[in-house]
């Protein structure tokens, strides 16, 4: 009897292999992170671009703990009952940025649907603390959707970071499978609302390789432009563990280049599109 093997994941292509991070700036920052036990997504997420970003003086920090109230099929962050809020966290993050001498900081967080404010007060206080301690550091905030509650989003607007980002993550058809507790249109409305309230630069990101079609990617990019989003990042989805959604396809560099060209034609200020692109890749140039 012939054995049929199903759902064999595609082999990882050569273009996803990266060099080990090197360089004086990287070595200095790595030493500081280890010495002071600083919490960066760059290290905890084993980002392939860590060496390049640190070399340019950019780093990403996660606030509000490391346990998320949502269980997205793509994300490697732990799901469950989050820790209590650390009200000293804003000062700790600001101090980390000062120690590392970061020129451009990206702040992100888990979803905190357990909190009435969605964590927005800590978000606002973190931005303010960074401003006080690091007046020359520019900021990007990669925020959750706050369940679309405007008063919580308004706290981000009031803090006025240079860039506010909220990721769509995938195309409309796959949203329920990929982000079960999120809504495609709600995310678009968050991005549209941020722009309407006066945020200078808005940004979003999507992952490819989850089974989307080219036309669905184009439509998502059009939806983002219709919401007046300025910057889009497009990268390859990589499965964190076997419990997460499988990779359906590895997108070629040529197709990523095609999406970049289309995004520029649509009028995005910046388009980062490539296999290793992540939300905060080249983030420092997105304020320009």
UniProtKB/Swiss-Prot annotation:
Residues 54-269 form the Radical SAM core domain. One of its GO terms (cellular component) is cytoplasm. It is an enzyme of class 2 (transferase). Its main location: cytoplasm. It is found in: Cytoplasm. PANTHER family: LIPOYL SYNTHASE (PTHR10949), LIPOYL SYNTHASE, MITOCHONDRIAL (PTHR10949:SF0). InterPro entries: Aldolase_TIM, Elp3/MiaA/NifB-like_rSAM, Lipoyl_synth, rSAM. The keyword Iron-sulfur applies. This is Lipoyl synthase. Binds 2 [4Fe-4S] clusters per subunit. One cluster is coordinated with 3 cysteines and an exchangeable S-adenosyl-L-methionine. Keywords: 4Fe-4S, Cytoplasm, Iron, Iron-sulfur, Metal-binding, S-adenosyl-L-methionine, Transferase. Its cofactor is [4Fe-4S] cluster. It catalyses: [[Fe-S] cluster scaffold protein carrying a second [4Fe-4S](2+) cluster] + N(6)-octanoyl-L-lysyl-[protein] + 2 oxidized [2Fe-2S]-[ferredoxin] + 2 S-adenosyl-L-methionine + 4 H(+) = [[Fe-S] cluster scaffold protein] + N(6)-[(R)-dihydrolipoyl]-L-lysyl-[protein] + 4 Fe(3+) + 2 hydrogen sulfide + 2 5'-deoxyadenosine + 2 L-methionine + 2 reduced [2Fe-2S]-[ferredoxin]. Its EC number is 2.8.1.8. [4Fe-4S] cluster 2 binds at residues 68, 72, 75. NCBIfam families: lipA (TIGR00510), PRK05481.1 (NF004019), PRK12928.1 (NF009544). One of its GO terms (molecular function) is metal ion binding. Pfam families: Radical_SAM. Pathway: Protein modification; protein lipoylation via endogenous pathway; protein N(6)-(lipoyl)lysine from octanoyl-[acyl-carrier-protein]: step 2/2. The keyword 4Fe-4S applies. [4Fe-4S] cluster 1 binds at residues 42, 47, 53, 280. Belongs to the radical SAM superfamily. Lipoyl synthase family.
């Amino acid at each position: 009897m012939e054995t049929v093997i199903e759902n064999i994941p595609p082999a990882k292509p050569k273009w996803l292999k990266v060099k080990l991070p090197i360089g004086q700036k990287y070595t200095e920052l790595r030493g500081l992170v280890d010495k002071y036990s600083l919490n960066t997504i760059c290290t905890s997420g084993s980002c392939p671009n860590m060496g390049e970003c640190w070399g340019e003086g950019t780093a990403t920090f996660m606030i509000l703990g490391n346990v998320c109230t949502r269980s997205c099929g793509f994300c490697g962050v732990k799901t469950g009952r989050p820790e209590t809020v650390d009200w000293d966290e804003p000062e700790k993050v600001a101090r980390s940025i000062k120690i590392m001498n970061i020129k451009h900081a990206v702040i992100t967080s888990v979803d905190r649907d357990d909190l009435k404010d969605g964590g927005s007060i800590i978000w606002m206080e973190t931005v303010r603390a960074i401003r006080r301690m690091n007046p020359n550091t520019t900021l990007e905030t990669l925020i959750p959707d706050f369940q679309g509650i405007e008063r919580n989003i308004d706290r981000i607007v009031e803090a006025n970071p240079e860039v506010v980002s909220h990721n769509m993550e995938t195309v409309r058809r796959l949203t329920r499978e990929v982000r079960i507790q999120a809504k495609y249109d709600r995310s678009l409305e968050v991005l549209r609302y941020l722009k309407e309230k006066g945020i200078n630069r808005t940004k979003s990101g999507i992952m490819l390789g989850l089974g989307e079609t080219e036309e669905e990617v184009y439509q998502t990019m059009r939806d983002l432009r219709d919401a007046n989003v300025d910057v889009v990042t497009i990268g390859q989805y990589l499965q964190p563990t076997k419990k997460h959604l499988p990779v359906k396809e590895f997108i070629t560099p040529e197709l990523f280049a095609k999406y970049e060209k289309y995004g520029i034609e649509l009028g995005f200020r910046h388009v980062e599109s490539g296999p290793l692109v992540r939300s905060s890749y080249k983030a420092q140039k997105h304020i320009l």
